[in-house]
Regions:
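Helix-loop-helix
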Residues: 1-44, 87, 172, 179-185, ...
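Intrinsic disorder/low-complexity segments
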Residues: 32-36, 46-47, 61, 122, ...
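Short, Gly/Pro- and small/polar-rich lid/capping loops
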Residues: 39-73
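Soluble non-transmembrane domains of integral membrane proteins
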Residues: 68-323
């Protein structure tokens, strides 16, 4: 069956590939035929005519800034130990930011702010406005201060004496670029003293798969000094002052910070859904209300760097929350990550160089902390095993009378001092731990690019085999070995637990422990290898603990003797037990009455 399953997807994939190639060949042939019908001189003439019309329109729009309407793109670079910032004279804005300490999957330097445009509207003449991003500024020479920071100014001046000055300053060991905007003649350049700022952004793939990175991308912002975010195709209108807006990818972010707040604005964000390397596009419109004065200044800052919790914490209030340690329905795991997982992880990373071993130590720490509950669970399981013969006798006695069996079973548990739900506590505890680690491993940049054993990157899935087709239900076109080890150890735990518990008569319950590990195969195959490695180690520890505790620590004869002793001691029923038994007795009476009532023919 498995061979047929894989063969089907391989054959389907081959057919689709052939069909795409055939369609492309047809399109190429049509394009070549159409190109032959167009004369070269007609193409040149059309281009010249289009350029002339475009230039005339730009000059007209620029009005008093007509000299800045046309120009040639030139760039200037500011650098420190962490980043290299390329500035362009067109718009006097940032063209790109290269992060020196981070690389992409193909070993190229990580670049941010590549498909960005930042600018604002200025009055250029009567009833005419232009975007600053369309005007050509004149750059000054670079200046270097005693503290090691470098600065440059971009200036444009109008025929009426107004001017715009952009000053950029890059400080040592910083991912933040200071951007000061000075408007000379602001009362003429702005309408009603409002600076309407526009930021157009488009993010591209930096991690292994664009699809997964899209899921991890979002827009974060601080409105009214409170953190919030949007992660679906959405539009957000700001009703309170905004401190910063951030375009976030899985491990990096580009954040625009207003040192004196944006007064209002809106952001529109949407993910791409095609097969390209593009992730999302954003249009952010922000307003800054300036005093009605001849000259005005706006202090901004552009952060382009890693989503590192400690770095962002020092950057601006609430910016560290860009790192997703748990949000929405998983917000309850954020304190676990912030106050337990992250400090312990960083502590181990302080003296262990390989992050795979750090994950192992973190796993052992978690299992050590939860060990009292684990022991309690195994003890409860041992008590249930000791009571199995008596439970079988009760079950045989009551037969199909489920109500009677349940009442007698509860009585037996109470007399023996057994909590039937005692074994569930560690399993329930694993739920918040799993979701906490899922958020942590997907957002902790220290894991990015870190190799361990056969995994090349602990922040992404490991690959031991690439398939010629893609398996649905989230499995993908690869096989992760850490996923296989996690699933196999989960199967072993299920087999061991089934051998220690009474046999289930219900076929669905009987096979349920085996179904869950199989489901993990599809859930885990695309998750970070750090998470599947954690799960593997945790399962191995579980198997070891079960074997040692059940065979060398827990004495079943002693447990039976203790339970027999407890039965001799009269126990007062709790209010909950009394109510529960009354409810069961009422249900039994109703069932007996229903069974005695003759059915109508």
């Amino acid at each position: 069956l498995g061979i047929l399953f894989f063969s089907y997807f391989w054959y389907t994939n081959q057919q689709q590939t052939a069909l795409v190639a055939f369609k492309k060949q047809q399109e190429d042939s049509t394009a070549k035929a159409q190109a032959k019908l167009v004369k070269p001189q007609d193409v040149v003439a059309a281009k010249i005519d289009s350029l002339q019309r475009d230039s005339i329109a730009k000059i007209a729009t620029a009005g008093n800034f007509a000299k800045a309407a046309l120009g040639k793109d030139t760039t200037v670079t500011l650098e420190n130990d962490l980043i290299s910032v390329v500035l362009t004279n067109k718009g006097g804005q940032v063209k790109s930011v290269t992060l020196k300490k981070y690389t992409t999957q193909d070993s190229a330097a990580v670049k941010l702010v590549q498909q960005n445009q930042m600018g604002y509207a200025v009055n250029t003449a009567d009833n005419k406005t232009a975007q600053s991003s369309d005007l050509y500024f004149t750059p000054s020479t670079l200046t270097k201060a005693q503290d090691g920071s470098t600065s440059i100014k971009f200036v444009i001046a109008s025929a009426t004496g107004t001017s715009i000055i952009h000053t950029y300053t890059l400080r040592p060991n910083s991912y933040a670029l200071d951007w000061d905007i000075e408007l000379v003649g602001a009362n003429q350049l702005l309408t009603a003293g409002v600076l309407n700022f526009t930021w157009l952004s488009e993010t591209s793939q930096l991690e292994r798969t664009a699809e997964y990175e899209r899921q991890m991308s979002n827009i974060c912002f601080s409105e009214g000094n409170e953190f919030d975010y949007i992660s679906a195709n959405n539009e957000k209108t700001f009703e309170k002052p905004v401190q910063w807006v951030s375009v976030v990818q899985q491990f990096f972010n580009t954040t625009l910070i207003a040192k004196n707040n944006f007064n209002s604005g809106a952001v529109n964000w949407s993910r791409y859904t095609d097969s390209s390397s593009k992730l999302a596009k954003t249009e952010t419109n922000l307003q800054i209300k300036l005093p009605q004065a001849a000259n005005s200044k706006v202090a901004l800052q552009l952060f382009a760097g890693p989503s590192d919790f400690e770095i962002l914490k020092k950057q601006a209030p609430e910016m560290e929350r860009i790192v997703n340690l748990g949000r929405d329905m998983y917000s309850f795991v954020r304190p676990i990550n912030k106050y337990i997982i992250m400090p312990v992880f960083d502590f181990f990373a302080g003296f262990v160089s390989n992050y795979g071993w750090v994950v192992l130590l973190l796993t052992l720490f978690i299992r050590l902390v939860t060990s009292p509950l684990t022991y309690s669970s195994y003890l409860s399981g041992a008590k249930m095993k000791v009571l199995k013969p008596e439970l079988d006798t009760i079950k045989k006695k009551f037969g199909d009378d489920q109500q009677g069996f349940a009442m007698e079973q509860m009585k037996l548990f109470r007399e023996a001092g057994v909590n039937p739900l005692g074994g569930c506590i560690p399993a329930l505890l694993q739920i918040p731990i799993f979701f906490a680690l899922y958020s942590f491993f997907n957002s902790h940049i220290a894991l990015r690019g870190q190799a361990f054993l056969w995994s090349k990157d602990l922040s992404s899935y490991d690959v031991i085999a690439t398939l010629p087709f893609s398996i649905p239900l989230g499995f993908g076109d690869h096989i992760s070995l850490f996923t296989i080890t996690a699933v196999l150890t989960s199967f072993l735990i299920s087999i061991y637990n089934m051998s220690m518990t009474p046999t289930q008569d219900n076929p669905a319950l009987k096979y349920m422990p085996y179904i869950f590990p199989f489901m993990l195969l599809f859930i885990f195959n695309r998750l970070p290898s750090a998470l599947t490695w954690y799960y593997t180690v945790s399962n191995i520890v579980t198997l070891g603990l079960q074997f040692v505790i059940q065979n060398y620590i827990i004495n079943h004869d002693k447990i039976l003797a203790q339970m027999d002793e407890k039965r001799k001691t009269p126990k007062a029923k709790s209010k909950w037990q009394t109510r529960f038994e009354q409810m069961q007795q009422s249900q039994k009476k109703l069932q007996d009455l229903k069974d005695k009532t003759p059915k109508k023919k």
